[in-house]
Regions:
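Non-heme di-metal
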Residues: 21-206
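N-terminal export/membrane-targeting signals
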Residues: 1-22
Length: 206
């Protein structure tokens, strides 16, 4: 896989200067972008409702994690949508479908979803986009992929703490990069490790 160091924001600027013909992008990549957009849109809505459920059950710290992840997934969805629209592809409105259960079950569902995205879905999408030199899609996919890996670890940790009765020891603050959705627990560096966005612009969930 080629190393992609360009920032998403810079890529958008380049697109304005030299628009891309959507006919030059393969159907497989546009289909993957559509699927990723649908998945991230659903995850964002689902996690927002999971956060409300966690609050009702008295798990304030887990609610914060769900809120942070929801914002991150919304950013991923917007990035995928931006690439599709730049390519001249119509993006249909998504009506998310999911079921809210207990916080424990919701965490298990989140772990399953993040596990699929970080081990199967995004690696496959990235491989295809890389082979097709679909650089903008590749950047957007990589942002989501690396963030979902972090979300998977955070959710697994939260479930472990919940099962052991230590939920209150979880982090009480999360930072989310508005450019790529990268999520930091407790504290964050001066700049995002993925997009190099300044910490001053990060979303804070506490």
């Amino acid at each position: 896989m080629k190393t992609k160091t360009a920032l998403f924001v810079l890529a958008i600027m380049l697109m304005v200067i030299a628009p891309i013909n959507s006919n030059s992008i393969s159907k497989s990549t546009t289909d993957n972008l559509k699927e990723a957009f649908k998945g991230e849109t659903t995850a964002s809505a689902k996690y927002a409702d999971y956060a409300k459920k966690a609050k009702k059950e008295g798990y304030a710290k887990i609610a914060l994690l769900f809120e942070a992840a929801s914002k991150a997934e919304h950013i991923h969805a917007n990035n995928h949508k931006a690439v599709l629209e730049q390519l001249g592809v119509k993006v249909d409105k998504i009506t998310p479908k999911y079921t809210v259960k207990s916080t424990k079950e919701n965490l298990e569902d989140a772990i399953s979803g993040e596990g699929y995205e970080s081990t199967t879905m995004y690696p496959g999408f990235i491989k295809t986009a890389d082979a097709e030199n679909s650089n903008l899609a590749l950047i957007s996919f990589n942002y989501a992929f690396k963030t979902e890996q972090k979300h998977l670890k955070l959710y697994k940790n939260a479930l472990e703490f919940l099962n052991s009765g230590k939920e209150k020891k979880l982090s009480s603050k999360y930072y989310v990069c508005p450019t790529c959705g990268n999520t930091y627990e407790g504290d964050a560096p001066a700049r995002c490790g993925l997009s190099m966005t300044s910490k001053e612009k990060f979303l804070i969930i506490k």
